[in-house]
Amino acid sequence: MGHPEPHFLGYGGVVTGPRELYDAIVAETQCNTAIIDGVLVNDWKDESELEVDDQGNAYTRQFGGRQIFAAFDLLEVDGESLLEIPLLERRRHLEGVLAPSPNVRLTPYVTRGLRAWRDTLQAQGFRRVVLKNWNSAYTPGKTTDDWLVIEKLKAAAP
């Protein structure tokens, strides 16, 4: 954020993202410049609310997927590095500078019950998850011993 052109970086370098999504991130950010760690989710599906039809039958609407940016960490804000600050504090800073919107989401932080979240994360288009120690620092380009990366979310066995 703070660059004149979309500036999404992936593991392999620059990632092309839609200008509208970049503009949405900029519009929802309350600072001049920021380095936000997150993921472009290509097939995001909003959770459906339970509705009732005229005959009293309950149903949920099925919506098509869309691309969103899901933010999960803030690494720098207005030129100040947050890399040495614990994750929980970086999260508080992230919530202070980035407002969630339909196309920009803050990923949930949970302390337990990952099994319950697995189905929700899969339904929303996430394919991997990173479990992090609340007090972990951020090391650019590396997974630390304080993190556990689950590369593929699988459906629960019956």
How would you label these PLM feature ranges?
Residues 1-158:
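Catalytic cores of nucleic-acid ligases and guanylyltransferases
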